[in-house]
Amino acid sequence: MQIPVALERLVFEFSRFPGVGRKTAQRLAFNILRYTTEETQNLTDALTQVKEQIRYCSVCSGFTDIDPCAICSHSSRDHQQVCVVEQPNNIFPIEKSGVFKGVYHVLMGAISPLDGIGPEQLNLKKLRNRIENKKISELILATNPVSYTHLTLPTSD
């Protein structure tokens, strides 16, 4: 039996998520078929809401619904201590630990020559500006320890 076109499209869209293969995408799609109309509408509303309301913080490039984000605008945070992460979602586990009291800077990726990602594609100019224009006493690198990480760091001229 062939999968109906609309269902196949949903499977395809789910399979575009990182780490989601065809079988998982099918399970998700089949599960949605069991949703009530209200549950389906709630999912649709949540997807629309996140696309309309979530943006990048103009200071750190983390996810936010206000600008600057709650972390960057919080007066009790140590703005001299900056934790550099690769992606906005890397902030959440650090925050969950409750240990770090500084602010963040998101690179929006990591250098990967094989994927064609060089320093120009990363958020390094903004980091350099923060270092030069703010009184930053500590820069903490919380990036993935891969062989190209050392290439991601800005150097002084």
Model regions and ranges:
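Extended interfacial segments that mediate partner engagement and assembly in macromolecular machines
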Residues: A25, H74-T143
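Single conserved hydrophobic/aromatic residue that forms the stacking wall/gate
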Residues: H150-D157
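Cys/His-rich Zn2+-binding cysteine-cluster or related metal-binding knuckle/ribbon modules and their
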Residues: Q2-E8, R16, Q26-V82, Q87-I91
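A generic alpha-helix structural signal
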Residues: V11, T44-L47, R128-I131
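Post-transcriptional modification and biogenesis factors for structured RNAs
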Residues: M1, E13, R130-K134, S156
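Gly/Ser/Thr-rich loops at beta-strand to alpha-helix junctions
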Residues: P145-Y148
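Short glycine-/acidic-enriched loop or helix-start segments at secondary-structure transitions
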Residues: C69, I94, L151
